[in-house]
Each structure stands twice: as C-alpha cells, then as structure tokens.
Amino acid sequence: MGVTGMTYMFTMVFSLIVLILSSSTVGYDYFQFTQQYQPAVCNSNPTPCNDPTDKLFTVHGLWPSNRNGPDPEKCKTTALNSQKIGNMTAQLEIIWPNVLNRSDHVGFWEKEWIKHGTCGYPTIKDDMHYLQTVIRMYITQKQNVSAILSKAAIQPNGTNRPLVDIENAIRRGTNNTKPKFKCQKNTRTTTELVEVTLCSDRDLKKFINCPHGPPQGSRFSCPSSVQY
C-alpha cells in the first residue's frame, strides 16, 4: 500500500473514531432547576393528592437542557442506588417530595435521575452526586423559590398578583437573571403559578437567563396576573 493509500486509511479510521465518540457523548448547554408549588400541582392534577400539601415550592428536578434542539433524556440505564441515600433521606423528603404520592419519594427521585440526571455528566458525576447537588443548590446556595419570594414580602396567600412582581422578586435573588414560569388552570378554572425554573450554566457555577418558557398560547403559558 502506498503513502496515499495509508493516509486515506488513517483518515477514515480517525473519522470513524471521532464519530463513535461524538455519538456516545450527550450534549447540553445549561441546567434547569425546576421547583413546583405543591398546592397548585395538586389543584391542577386530574387525580387529587391524597395528603395535605405544604405551601412551598419544592424541587421537581435538575435538568440538563439545550437552547436549541431537544433536551437529552435517559442517557444511561443506571438505576438509583437507594441503599446509598442514607442520611440524605430526611432532607430530600422535605425539599424534594413526591407531591402526588408521598409514599414513594424514592421512586420520584429515581425517575428524575434516570430521565435527567444520567445526562448531566461531567457536571453530575453519578446518582448520589445528583442528589447531593440538589441539596446544595436548594439549601446551601439558597436557590429556594419560596424563600426568595418571602424575602420580597410575596407570600402564598392564594390571591392574584402581577406576574412581573414575582419575576422581579426572583431576579433580585438570582443576580438579575430571567426565570421561567409554568402556569395551569386549576379545577376552579383559576390560573395558578405551578412551577418556577432557575437556570444555570452547564457547570452550575452561575445563574443565566432562562432561554425560553412555554410557547405563548399553550396551556402552560402564564397570563399577566396569576394566583399564588
């Protein structure tokens, strides 16, 4: 084989290796830290919640996401090792409860880990690091939407209020970055604030503006005034 043939073969092999590596690497641009307001989740759910809710925003999930194109999901088949959760359980049950089924918190964490957490490498190392990261963000770093709103004297009293007031309060608590909102009509056809998402860069080092919310006109978009 001549030099030209060897060069061609080397190029083909190298290209194949690059293709294999790139196909096995899942990309993401940023993280969404989504929190759900427990009463609104239950009010908008077709099946009523069995247990009383706390008037708190608690964690829905931490999701690797993309500005353009689909968000990565289920990147590995690694299950959550519930035997290792140990002394994190008490904190997680408070800040990350399964609102719809409080008898199965672990099942909720595992669902979030498999669907989203497995796609967070290298920022998220493994299942326990995923849970530890959520605890750190919500408690240590005070990325707690209820606390942020309370600091701005916005309390969950079930009244309608301008969405811009809620946004401005959250901006003050997140270095003036834009959050994302999800709203939904409850059984009384009142539109409630169901979720607030705080966005961070792909290394979870700093807040960023959330790129986009639900499309205008969708059933999850928020009007100018919402109940909270």
From Swiss-Prot:
GO biological process terms held by the UniProt record:
RNA catabolic process
Query: What UniProt keywords are attached to this protein's entry?
Result: Disulfide bond, Endonuclease, Glycoprotein, Hydrolase, Lyase, Nuclease, Signal
User: Can you state which reaction this protein catalyses?
Assistant: a ribonucleotidyl-ribonucleotide-RNA + H2O = a 3'-end 3'-phospho-ribonucleotide-RNA + a 5'-end dephospho-ribonucleoside-RNA + H(+)
Q: Where is the active site?
A: 60 (proton donor), 112, 116 (proton acceptor)
Q: What are the protein's GO molecular function terms?
A: ribonuclease T2 activity; RNA binding
Extract the InterPro entries matched here: Ribonuclease_T2_eukaryotic (IPR033697), RNase_T2-like (IPR001568), RNase_T2-like_sf (IPR036430), RNase_T2_His_AS_1 (IPR018188)
Q: What is this protein called?
A: Ribonuclease S-1
Q: Which organism is it from?
A: Pyrus pyrifolia
